[in-house]
Amino acid sequence: MPLASQSAVSILCSLATMTSSMNSARIISRLGTGKVTAFSTLLTAAALLGFSFSGSFWFMCLMAIPLGLGAGCVDSALNNYVSIHYNATVMSFLHCFYGVGVMVSPYIMSVVINSAVGWRGGYRTASLIQALIGSILLLALPLWKKAHGEESIQAEKKMKVLPISQTLRIPGALMTCLLFLTFCAIEVICGGWSATYMVEAKHMSANLAARATMYFYLGMALGRFLSGVAAKKLTPWQIIFISMGILGVSQTTLLVSGNNVLTMAALLMTGLGVGPLYPNFNYMTPLHFGKDVSQSVMGMQMTFASIGTIAAPALCGVLGQLLGMGIFPAYLMIFYVLTAVGIIALRRTLRQVGRLQQ
């Protein structure tokens, strides 16, 4: 399939993800987090199975829609549920497994693709794994009520479902959404373009460049794991400040380093620094905006995160083609500065309305 066609499928999937995230509060208030999690997982399993039988570009576009719809709603649902019912440690560990999945899943897919079953078998394997998880979640639906009582089920049904404009008018909501755009942009830019930067600008071998990208994802998983451990002693804001400090050092190192080893270390540190931001900002959503509207805000946070993951790497590719991939460190630094400025602005707004958590 041509690269342009692949991009179209990815964009369709991302648009479906954003649509699902924006409507997550309405869906969850009707079905509940347990059913949304189970059905979304099964929906993605069906979409992956559809990909494996695809014989045309248009059918792949069609399958991208349920894949995105399932991914968007479950992300928003679980983030809000964990932030309300569990502590910051659980939230960080939850997202730590995302980093583990990002590292392990390409290896599993490559093994299957290189076997006799080919790429179709790879998608069927992924679909089977999702279907098994979805089936377990379906069987475990009664446990949701037992875990936190009937009160939590009723609270979900009574949550406020706000329109987009009203959600973004909540003091601090727009700024926290923009923060999700900027630091998620750092994640996907590093994951998508670091290897190209290492090869084209640093003249590194393709194998070594791929390893550097793996170091970034390793750092992200490790950062979220350490965030979960540190959450027992530190507040989310303290962890965010430490993470931003690490991220600042790593971005400066990327800008000035002429040494490949230092550059690879900087990518590891970038993952270590950016990793804790996503779970900790998610965890503070009900604390900053209230449990009654947190699902609406959470859905918009996931939407802006999706915008960042689509637009930022695409713009990086365009700039890299026009100016060369040497712009990679400076491009990342711009998003780091925007994140730092956004954090200052968010804290000022929350302090003014008396909702800032220490």
Where do the model's predicted regions map?
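Extracytoplasmic gate region of multi-pass secondary transporters
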Residues: P171-M214, L218-A221
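Symmetry-related core transmembrane helices of the 12-TM Major Facilitator Superfamily/SLC fold
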Residues: G121-P142, P329-A345
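Conserved MFS/SLC helix-loop-helix module at the cytosolic interface between two early adjacent transmembrane helices
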Residues: T19-W58
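Helix-breaking motifs and short loop linkers at transmembrane-helix boundaries and internal kinks
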Residues: G32, F53-W58, H203, T235, ...
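Interfacial helix-cap and linker-helix signal at transmembrane-aqueous boundaries
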Residues: I27-I28, I108-V117, M198-V199, A230-A231, ...
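Helix-to-loop junctions at the C-terminal end of transmembrane segments
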Residues: S20-T33, G223-T235, G320-Q321
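Residue-level signature of mid-helix packing/kink "hotspots" within the transmembrane helices
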Residues: C13-M22, M103, Y217-F225, T309-I310
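Cytoplasmic helix-loop-helix junction between adjacent transmembrane helices
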Residues: M63-F97
